[in-house]
UniProtKB/Swiss-Prot annotation:
The lineage of its organism: Eukaryota, Metazoa, Chordata, Craniata, Vertebrata. One of its GO terms (biological process) is neurotransmitter uptake. It is found in: Membrane; Cell membrane. This is the catalytic component of the active enzyme, which catalyzes the hydrolysis of ATP coupled with the exchange of sodium and potassium ions across the plasma membrane. This action creates the electrochemical gradient of sodium and potassium ions, providing the energy for active transport of various nutrients. This is Sodium/potassium-transporting ATPase subunit alpha-2. GO terms for cellular component: cell projection; cytoplasm; plasma membrane; sodium:potassium-exchanging ATPase complex.
Length: 1017
């Protein structure tokens, strides 16, 4: 089977259900491991299978035929959402729906009034227009924000068309890589991207970098031999979009485009269904709550008004009025702006968020599955340890060269550094003299580059060393003899040569009979061999890649200058050499990672490492960064300590666990769940991309909110499936950036922790904003309710309500997004999405039932004071509504017998509206200050939030402007107030402040008590 059976384009089924089943089946197919057997075929069988001459390539006619049949060699781009759909989602998604319903109801009410009355009031018409405008403006704003992020995304895409060198009809030609077909004979050399999946038929020192596919940072050798059953591990297959690092190779293309291994991963990623974000679910829950309250109030008063004798049509208008009054017009804009501010703050801290809702998702994350290479580590091999003079020395692996130093005076070190510098083909790329050595780019294999940098740092210019000891001959590294050897002219001896050699330590040692100690050659005895073995095991156990080094001074009488050394028919000694030492390399952890992992742990977030690398290396790095914390053991550790076989250890005793990809392959979902449940510290090593996806799904089954980090194409399915996918901005592949929700611009795991902190903070602050905004709903609704029940003149008009919701309340509500955290938010457990809601019943009861009621009292007090000053005592107001609103009544008497015309009555009524509005502003001062904290006293929190202080001043200034600005009486029916009327609501404002401070004091004194259960939101 050549992987062509399931092409992602094959979904054509008549009915939707069948199509869904088909899609699920395909995804399951894609989740399976790669299945191909071309690596097992002999070259003749290969030629027959693909009808190709292995030396001359395809004929042009045959190539054109295959191209027409298979289509171009390119990945199908993931289905993109058209811009108009994105825009409509912003206009009609989530919260906006509530406002649209409100607007439609307003137009409906206006229509009813227009049909019934001769001169209908235009309030409902204004209200409908304003609601629609709010949704449209906010929608445009959110759309613009997301479009900006996706613009940054598009700039990541590399637009350079890739070229490939193919041999057709015996001639080498450069063609566009899209035109490569199955069966083509392709040649790749160091620096090229592999244009398609191909089976190698001949190679010369070829190495490829498979890290984007498997996550292994070491370059892999490629040769025609079939070395492994698994096609991903065998040496004779090269994969599409991996890079050839050095050497050359020829191969036959076995699959192109979406049928390549890389293509299957990309289709797997684009085919996954993405769940809703936690914040979207929260907003839905909130809308359900608010709608519930609104409909309940509306229907209650609808029935009540019918009982009180109103007509059906009047009752319907009341019903609509109450429902609309419950809609918090300003909240949609507030939430959008708060999320945008956080997204901007995160971008400054190197987290680019692609969609606003992901901002909060990161805060509710409870599990992070992190890739190792490049995310937790620096993604550059570095020399970590040396063993010479029978001692292990530590090298410096820090990013800024501030780490350990060792004694460089030993003559043995001089010999070791000379071998590492000479027997080494890596060079620095030109023009980097001003860059620090550790950051320079090199040409060559990762291990050799590490040696080059190490020697350059400790011994000065390697280039000078090589110029003084010119190379005469060399045997490059190959997988059969596992060493690399070169012979150089010695600078200190005008006649002599030195032979230097490095390679796998055990292979080097068996060629040596002597060892260099303190600069003296001594015979290599059993004791030294044991010391070597111990050092080798210790360094290998640290997950490091160990190389051995030896040399031999060639006798000048046998090998004078000008001697013809022959590397093929070896005419010089390659045994009886002198062993000098070991050097070991590792891709070291990034400096900020251990601290970040510690913060995650105290924040209750489980960090799981998922990598394609070796278990030993993975475990060493996991211990280095604290994913496996000190003192925690795996089953293997316990077995080694107690000296018993692994099978006798109870796996539950081990807190840590390293799972090998091959074991994961045979596990059932239940066994995986068992591991995820029972171990707190988990490392998955040697995993394939499909397994990454299975691990993420496993975590989600446990009810976790999962964040996944990754940079390779292999990570994209997991990135897409996770609740929040985090891609790397520098090292990340385009496919992974496409699949992710967030991009770390500096590739640093530590940035995720700041992201989590911002996400948690915005969740807390959104609660505060919502509590603040909802509270003023009660003083806005109650006037209308009393107007219906007690038949009093309307205390607060529609226009004034809009001035509060879209005017005075906006800036203060947004200013709460800038509020600092109350306690250390990184010390608490992640929120449980099932129980810990953004808006819960307790928040509604606090805002509506307690604080809102006090605010309404303040407003009514002011209303009654003004009417009483004008001669209407409260008792006279009951039942006066019909006469009050009747245009033909111009002789309405007040409590003192004075007669009022319709116009005069209305001026007093509108003055009352203005004063009620001013009272709400005054009580909202206190509300804003108490909403700063949910548990602490305001005196503990302080007033450091400058934006909030500005918000207080701004709402007061706006209220004064609306009241005193000339012309407002005509435009908004707002009238100037006497100064004393502003003070009517002050006592209520103080009452709110005192009430809430006492409540919070009880909260802190009796945590978990009755008050907390009933009022802590």
């Amino acid at each position: 089977m050549d992987g062509r059976e399931y092409s992602p384009a094959a979904t054509t089924s008549e009915n939707g259900g069948g199509r869904r089943k088909q899609k699920e089946k395909e995804l399951d197919e894609l989740k399976k491991e790669v299945n191909l057997d071309d690596h097992k075929l002999s070259l003749d069988e290969l030629g027959r299978k693909y009808q190709v001459d292995l030396s001359r390539g395809l004929s042009n006619a045959r190539a054109a035929e295959v191209l027409a049949q298979d289509g171009p060699n390119a990945l199908t781009p993931p289905p993109t959402t058209p811009e108009w759909v994105k825009f409509c989602r912003q206009l009609f998604g989530g919260f906006s729906i509530l406002l649209w319903i409100g607007a439609i109801l307003c137009f409906l009410a206006y229509g009813i009034q227009a049909a019934m009355e001769d001169e209908p009031s235009n309030d409902n018409l204004y209200l409908g227009v304003v609601l629609a405008a709010v949704v449209i403006v906010t929608g445009c704003f959110s759309y613009y924000q997301e479009a900006k992020s996706s613009k940054i995304m598009d700039s990541f895409k590399n637009m350079v068309p890739q070229q490939a060198l193919v041999i057709r009809e015996g001639e080498k030609i450069q063609i566009n890589a899209e035109n490569v077909v199955v069966g083509d004979l392709v040649e790749v050399k160091g620096g090229d991207r592999v244009p398609a999946d191909m089976r190698i038929i001949s190679s010369h020192g070829c190495k490829v970098d498979n890290s984007s596919l498997t996550g292994e940072s070491e370059p892999q050798t490629r040769s025609p031999e079939f070395t492994h059953e698994n096609p991903l591990e065998t040496r004779n297959i090269c994969f599409f979009s991996t890079n050839c690092v050095e050497g050359t190779a020829r191969g036959i293309v076995i699959s192109t485009g979406d049928r390549t291994v890389m293509g299957r991963i990309a289709s797997l990623a684009s085919g996954l269904e993405v769940g809703r974000t936690p914040i979207a679910m929260e907003i839905e829950h909130f809308i359900r709550l608010i709608t519930g309250v609104a409909v309940f109030l509306g229907l209650s008063f609808f029935i009540l008004s019918l009982i009180l004798g109103y007509t059906w049509l009047e009752a319907v208008i009341f019903l609509i009025g109450i429902i609309v009054a419950n809609v918090p017009e300003g909240l949609l804009a507030t939430v959008t702006v708060c999320l945008t501010l956080t997204a901007k703050r995160m971008a400054r801290k190197n987290c680019l968020v692609k969609n606003l809702e992901a901002v909060e998702t990161l805060g509710s994350t409870s599990t992070i599955c992190s890739d190792k290479t490049g995310t937790l580590t620096q993604n550059r091999m570095t020399v970590a340890h040396m063993w010479f003079d029978n001692q292990i020395h530590e090298a410096d692996t820090t990013e800024d060269q501030s780490g350990a130093t060792f004694d460089k005076r030993s003559p043995t070190w001089a010999a070791l550094s000379r071998i590492a510098g000479l027997c080494n083909r890596a060079v620095f790329k030109p023009g980097q003299e001003n860059i620090s050595i550790s950051k320079r780019d090199t040409a060559g294999d990762a291990s050799e580059s590490a040696l080059l940098k190490c020697i350059q740092l400790s011994c000065g210019s390697v280039k000078k060393m090589r110029d003084k000891n010119p190379k005469v001959t060399e045997i490059p590294f190959n997988s059969t003899n596992k060493y690399q050897l070169s012979i150089h002219e010695r600078e200190e001896d005008p006649q002599g040569h030195i032979l230097v050699m490095k390679g796998a330590p055990e292979r080097i040692l068996e060629r040596c009979s002597r060892i260099l100690l303190q600069g003296q050659e001594v015979p290599l005895d059993e004791e030294m061999k044991e010391a070597f073995q111990n050092a080798y095991l210790e360094l290998g156990g640290l997950g490091e890649r160990v190389l051995g080094f030896c040399h031999l001074y060639l006798p000048p009488d046998k090998f004078p200058r000008g001697f013809r050394f022959d590397a093929d028919e070896v005419n010089f000694p390659t045994s009886d050499l002198c062993f000098v030492g070991l050097m070991s390399m590792i891709d070291p952890p990034r400096a900020a990672v251990p601290d970040a992992v510690g913060k995650c742990r105290s924040a209750g977030i489980k960090v799981i490492m998922v990598t394609g690398d070796h278990p030993i290396t993975a475990k060493a790095i996991a211990k280095g960064v604290g994913i496996i914390s000190e003192g925690n053991e795996t089953v293997e550790d316990i077995a080694a300590r107690l000296n018993i076989p692994v099978s006798q250890v109870n796996p539950r005793e081990a807190k840590a666990c390293v799972v090998h990809g091959s074991d994961l392959k045979d596990m059932t979902a239940e066994q995986l769940d068992e591991i995820l449940r029972n171990h707190t510290e988990i490392v998955f090593a040697r995993t394939s991309p499909q397994q990454k996806l299975i691990i993420v799904e496993g975590c989600q089954r446990q009810g976790a909110i999962v964040a996944v980090t990754g940079d390779g194409v292999n990570d994209s399915p997991a990135l897409k499936k996770a609740d929040i996918g985090i891609a790397m901005g520098i090292a990340g592949s385009d496919v992974s950036k496409q699949a992710a929700d967030m991009i770390l611009l500096d590739d640093n795991f530590a940035s995720i922790v700041t992201g989590v902190e911002e996400g948690r903070l915005i969740f807390d602050n959104l609660k505060k904003s919502i509590a603040y905004t909802l509270t003023s709903n009660i003083p806005e609704i109650t006037p209308f309710l009393l107007f219906i029940i007690a038949n009093i003149p309307l205390p607060l008009g529609t226009v004034t309500i809009l001035c509060i919701d879209l005017g005075t309340d906006m800036v203060p509500a947004i200013s709460l997004a800038y509020e600092a955290a109350e306690s250390d938010i990184m010390k608490r457990q992640p929120r449980n999405p099932r129980t810990d809601k953004l808006v819960n019943e307790r928040l509604i009861s606090m805002a509506y039932g307690q604080i809102g009621m006090i605010q309404a009292l303040g407003g009514f007090f002011t209303y009654f004071v003004i009417l009483a000053e004008n001669g209407f005592l409260p008792a006279r107001l009951l039942g006066v509504r019909l006469a009050w609103d009747d245009r033909s009544t111009n002789d309405l008497e007040d409590s003192y017998g004075q007669e009022w015309t319709y116009e005069q009555r209305k001026v007093v009524e509108f003055t009352c509206h203005t004063a009620f509005f001013a009272s709400i502003v005054v009580v909202q001062w206190a509300d804003l200050i108490i909403c700063k904290t949910r548990r602490n006293s305001v005196f503990q929190q302080g007033m450091k939030n400058k934006i909030l202080i500005f918000g207080l001043l701004e709402e007061t200034a706006l209220a004064a402007f609306l009241s005193y600005c000339p012309g407002m009486g005509v435009a908004l029916r707002m009238y100037p107030l006497k100064v004393t009327w502003w003070f009517c609501a002050f006592p209520y404002s103080l009452l709110i402040f005192a009430y809430d401070e006492v409540r919070k004091l009880i909260l802190r004194r009796y945590p978990g008590g009755w008050v907390e259960k009933e009022t802590y939101y």
